[in-house]
Design a protein with these regions (language model features):
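Core dinuclear metal-dependent hydrolase active-site scaffold
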Residues: 1-73, 126-202, 288-301
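Active-site environment of divalent metal-dependent phosphoester hydrolases
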Residues: 22, 83-89, 120-124, 196-201, ...
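A short helix->loop->beta-strand "cap" motif at the edges of active sites that frequently abuts
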Residues: 34-35, 107-113, 246-251, 273-274
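Active-site neighborhood of phospho(di)ester-bond hydrolases with catalytic His/Asp-centered motifs
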Residues: 37-41, 75-86, 114-117, 190-195, ...
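Active-site metal-binding motif and surrounding structural segment of the metallo-beta-lactamase
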Residues: 52-114, 205, 209-216, 223-224
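A short acidic, amphipathic alpha-helical/loop segment
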Residues: 93, 202-207, 240, 266
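Charged helix-capping and loop-helix junction motifs
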Residues: 97, 175, 208, 230-240
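Binuclear metal-ion centers of metallo-dependent hydrolases, dominated by the metallo-beta-lactamase
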Residues: 232-301
Length: 301
């Protein structure tokens, strides 16, 4: 598979990221013992710049949805960091997530689902979504377990989940997320959804404590700068990313950050680090910042 990266005996295949043209951090991680599908969700926003999605965005959405469904066929375990629809697939018909009930059944069937606690450290909106998901998993006979601060062993592979960290800065109304560390005898890969930098210092410390070979992480949402994301939090995120780049192997920095046309200017110091790349760059593909350029794609610039 052309998009597959290797770190020791761990294979990593990024499936959906903003640099591929969609909202997602879906990733397939394979070790000699277990294959894990991380955050199997994808979405495009109904409105950006007051405009509906361009044709290219719909095409990218379908492409990534197909990638996720194919990856699920290979997976033994599915992990869910939180309950936003770009990070899990609901048992609902949703146009902007390219899913319906059958999509979800095919995705979760016969897999072990390790998920964020649906009742603790969660906001009301995500609690409703979590309840809807777990109820349907139970109806379908799908095994699931709460993963917060727990470890699961599969042969010589260990899946280690973080405590719930804020979805961005401390005190955010967006709730909490889990990070996932996949560890084998000779490599470590870490997936950090929606920590937005990270802004929160304890999240940084958990991410770097074992000096992972690869970190896949969501950058700060600079497209919301001055609206829902402050300059102070951007400075924290930048400082933490610079520190991270010195303490880990490779960094794939993507997701929220790439909804901003000027994302490289916002974090120019970070991208000067030789080990920080987008998901598209990591796999040798051209970046497709479709949401960020929706105005141009729609001829409304």
């Amino acid at each position: 598979m052309a998009r597959t990266l290797r770190f020791g005996d761990i294979k990593v295949r990024p499936l959906g990221f903003e640099s591929f043209g969609v909202r997602s951090m879906a990733t397939l991680i394979e070790t000699p013992d277990v294959t894990v599908l991380v955050d199997p969700g994808v979405s495009i926003p109904p409105k950006r710049y007051g405009l509906p999605p361009a044709d290219e965005e719909w095409e990218a959405l379908e492409e990534v949805r197909e990638e996720i469904q194919r990856a699920a066929d290979r997976a033994d375990v599915i992990t869910i960091s939180h309950y936003h629809y770009d990070h899990h697939t609901p048992f609902l018909e949703r146009e902007y997530e390219a899913c319906d009930e059958e999509t979800a059944k095919e995705l979760y069937s016969d897999r072990l689902v390790l998920l964020k606690d649906p009742e603790e450290n969660i906001n009301p909106n995500q609690m409703r979504r979590a309840k809807a998901l777990t109820s349907r998993l139970e109806e379908e006979g799908v095994e699931y377990e709460v993963a917060d601060e727990r470890s699961f062993e599969f042969g010589d592979t260990r899946l280690e989940f973080s405590p719930p960290f804020p979805h961005g800065p401390e005190g955010t109304s967006l709730g909490y997320v889990l990070c996932l560390r996949v560890r084998t005898e000779n490599a470590t890969v870490l997936h950090a959804s929606d920590v937005q930098g990270p802004v929160y210092r304890p999240a940084l410390e958990w991410i770097v404590e074992d000096r992972p070979d690869l970190v896949l992480i969501s950058g700060p949402p600079t497209y919301l700068l001055g609206f829902r994301f402050s300059k102070e939090n951007l400075e924290k995120a930048s400082d933490h990313l610079l520190e991270m780049s010195d303490r880990v192997g490779q960094v794939i920095l993507d997701h929220h950050l790439l909804r901003d046309k000027k994302y490289r200017d916002r974090l120019s110091d970070v991208y000067e680090s030789s080990n920080v790349v987008t998901a598209a760059e990591a796999v040798g593909e051209e970046e497709r910042l479709l949401e960020a350029h929706r105005d141009e794609l729609s001829g409304e610039e």
